[in-house]
C-alpha cells in the first residue's frame, strides 16, 4: 500500500474516525488563482492545458501550495469523453463549451465509438500518473467524470443549455435513442474511471450537474439508473486500499435515499439541501460532502467562519463529513477568502471529532 501522509479525506468518505473534518473545493484549481491564469496563458487554451500532463499537474498542485487542503482533484473537464467520441469540443468566449457535431438522432448515436481510455484519453491518464508522482503521498488524488445524463445534455444540446428542450424532446419523443446514448456513455465512463483508478486516482467522483432538471421518475430512469450501472462496474480497491466513490447530483436533494442505494460511499450535497436533514435521512449509509454556497466566499472572513460553524453544527458530532462548497468556486472570489474558509473548517471542526 502506498503511504499517505494525510488520509483524512479517504477516511471520512468511509465514515472512519478523523481528527478534523477534511476539506477541499470543487474547481479548487481554477481562475480565481492568479498562478492558474498564468499557467493557462502559457498553455494557450483550456484544452491544451488539459492535454499537457506537466501543466495539468502544475495547476492541480497550485491550490495545495496555498492552502492545507485534504485532497487534490485531477485538473480536467467532464467533456473529455464526448470529445474523444469525435464530437469536436471547442470553447466559445463567454459561451462555454460547444460541439461542432452534436447528436441529432439515432444514426449519430449508433456511430459513436466507446473510447479506449489509454488511447484517445491517454492524456488524462498521463496527467493522473504525473500528479500522483508529484504529490509524493501528501494527500489523495480524486479522479472524476461527468454522469451519462449530464454528458448527454451537452452532446444533444450542442453545448450549455438553460431549458434543456432539445434533450427533453429526445427523452420524450425518442426515448430509445436516448437510452442507447446513455448506455454507451455509461460503458465509456466506467472504462474511463477504472483507467483513472489504475493510473493512480485514489477516489472518484461522478458529477451529475444537470440531474436536477428532471422529474423524479425521469431522474431514476435517465440519470440514476446509469450512475448505478457505473458504480457496479467500478474497481473499488487498488494499491491495497478501498477506492471510495462519490455521486453528486446538483439539485438532487429530494432523491438522497435513492442515490444512497447505488452502493456509492458518499453523496455530494448542493447548498439548497439542509445537511442536518441529509444526515438524518442517509447518514447511516453514506458519507456526505458539502455544502456551503460558493457565493459565501464573497463575504467577509468573519461571515465565512459563521457559515462554516453553522454547517459543522448541522452535521454534528462524529464521522462521515467531507467539507466542500455546494458547487464549484467562482472565478472572481478573493483567494484569501478561500484560505479563510479552509482554515475555519479545520479549526472549528476539531471539537466534533473528540
UniProtKB/Swiss-Prot annotation:
GO cellular component annotations of the record: cytosol
Annotated site, Transition state stabilizer, chain positions: 77
Reactions listed under catalytic activity: uroporphyrinogen III + 4 H(+) = coproporphyrinogen III + 4 CO2
InterPro entries documented for this protein: UROD/MetE-like_sf, Uroporphyrinogen_deCO2ase_HemE, Uroporphyrinogen_deCOase
Keywords, comma-separated and alphabetical: Cytoplasm, Decarboxylase, Lyase, Porphyrin biosynthesis
The EC number(s) this enzyme carries: 4.1.1.37
A Gene Ontology BP annotation from the UniProt entry: protoporphyrinogen IX biosynthetic process from glutamate
GO molecular function, one term: uroporphyrinogen decarboxylase activity
Pathway: Porphyrin-containing compound metabolism; protoporphyrin-IX biosynthesis; coproporphyrinogen-III from 5-aminolevulinate: step 4/4
Cell division is among the record's keywords: no
Residues binding substrate, per UniProt: 27-31, 77, 154, 209, 327
Subcellular location(s) per record: Cytoplasm
Family note: Belongs to the uroporphyrinogen decarboxylase family.
Stated role: Catalyzes the decarboxylation of four acetate groups of uroporphyrinogen-III to yield coproporphyrinogen-III.
NCBIfam families to which the protein is assigned, alphabetical: hemE (TIGR01464)
Subunit-structure text: Homodimer.
This protein's name: Uroporphyrinogen decarboxylase
UniProt source species: Cronobacter sakazakii (strain ATCC BAA-894) (Enterobacter sakazakii)
Amino acid at each position: 500500500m502506498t503511504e499517505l501522509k494525510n488520509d483524512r479525506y479517504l477516511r471520512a468518505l468511509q465514515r472512519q474516525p478523523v481528527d478534523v473534518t477534511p476539506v477541499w473545493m470543487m474547481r479548487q484549481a481554477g481562475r480565481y488563482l492568479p498562478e492558474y491564469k498564468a499557467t493557462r496563458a502559457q498553455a494557450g487554451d483550456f484544452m491544451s492545458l488539459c492535454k499537457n500532463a506537466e501543466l495539468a499537474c502544475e495547476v492541480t498542485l497550485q491550490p495545495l501550495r496555498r492552502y492545507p487542503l485534504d485532497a487534490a482533484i485531477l485538473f480536467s473537464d467532464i467533456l473529455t469523453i464526448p470529445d474523444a467520441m469525435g464530437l469536436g469540443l471547442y470553447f466559445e468566449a463567454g459561451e462555454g463549451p460547444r460541439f461542432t457535431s452534436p447528436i441529432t438522432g439515432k444514426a449519430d448515436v449508433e456511430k459513436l465509438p466507446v473510447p479506449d481510455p489509454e488511447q484517445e484519453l491517454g492524456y488524462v491518464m498521463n496527467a493522473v500518473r504525473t500528479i500522483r508522482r508529484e504529490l509524493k503521498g501528501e494527500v489523495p488524488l480524486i479522479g472524476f467524470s461527468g454522469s451519462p445524463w449530464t454528458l448527454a445534455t451537452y452532446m444533444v444540446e450542442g453545448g450549455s443549455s438553460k431549458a434543456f428542450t432539445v434533450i427533453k424532446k429526445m427523452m420524450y419523443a425518442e426515448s430509445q435513442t436516448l437510452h442507447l446514448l446513455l448506455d454507451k456513455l455509461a460503458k465509456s465512463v466506467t472504462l474511463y474511471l477504472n483507467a483513472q483508478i489504475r493510473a493512480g486516482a485514489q477516489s472518484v467522483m461522478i458529477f451529475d450537474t444537470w440531474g436536477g432538471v428532471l422529474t423524479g421518475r425521469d431522474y431514476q430512469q435517465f440519470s440514476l439508473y446509469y450512475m448505478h450501472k457505473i458504480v457496479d462496474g467500478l474497481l473499488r480497491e487498488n494499491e491495497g486500499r478501498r477506492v471510495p466513490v462519490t455521486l453528486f447530483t446538483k439539485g438532487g436533494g429530494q432523491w438522497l435515499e435513492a442515490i444512497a442505494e447505488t452502493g456509492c460511499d458518499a453523496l455530494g450535497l448542493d447548498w439548497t439541501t439542509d445537511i442536518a436533514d441529509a444526515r438524518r435521512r442517509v447518514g447511516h449509509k453514506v458519507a456526505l460532502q458539502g455544502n456551503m454556497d460558493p457565493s459565501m466566499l464573497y463575504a467577509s472572513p468573519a461571515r465565512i467562519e459563521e457559515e462554516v460553524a453553522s454547517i459543522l453544527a448541522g452535521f454534528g458530532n462524529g464521522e462521515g463529513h467531507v467539507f466542500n462548497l455546494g458547487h464549484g468556486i467562482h472565478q472572481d472570489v478573493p483567494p484569501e477568502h478561500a484560505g479563510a474558509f479552509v482554515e475555519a473548517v479545520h479549526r472549528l471542526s476539531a471539537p466534533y471529532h473528540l
